[in-house]
């Protein structure tokens, strides 16, 4: 599932990774990520 696109909320998408970069936020428990984290940046 590494590299899969994950949807956070309207207009914000992330990418599934085992570990997120320090400048990115992490959302755990997303089905599409199959146990990985969804790493994303907010646009504001």
Swiss-Prot record:
User: Protein name, please?
Assistant: Alpha-amylase inhibitor magnificamide
Where does this protein reside within or beyond the cell? Secreted
Give the misc comment. Answer: A synonymy between H.magnifica and R.crispa is controversial.
Function of the protein:
Mammalian alpha-amylase (AMY2A) inhibitor. The recombinant peptide inhibits porcine pancreatic (Ki=0.17 nM) and human saliva alpha-amylases (Ki=7.7 nM). It does not show antimicrobial (tested on fungi and bacteria) or channel modulating activities (tested on 18 voltage-gated sodium and potassium channles).
Instruction: Give this protein's Gene Ontology molecular function annotations.
Output: alpha-amylase inhibitor activity
Sequence similarity: Belongs to the sea anemone alpha-amylase inhibitor family.
Q: Does the keyword Cell division apply?
A: no
Could you tell me which species this protein originates from? Heteractis magnifica (Magnificent sea anemone)
């Amino acid at each position: 599932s590494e590299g899969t696109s994950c949807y956070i909320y309207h207009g914000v998408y992330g990418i599934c990774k085992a570990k997120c970069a320090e400048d990115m936020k992490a959302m755990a428990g997303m089905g599409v990520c199959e146990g990985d984290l969804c790493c994303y940046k907010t646009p504001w």
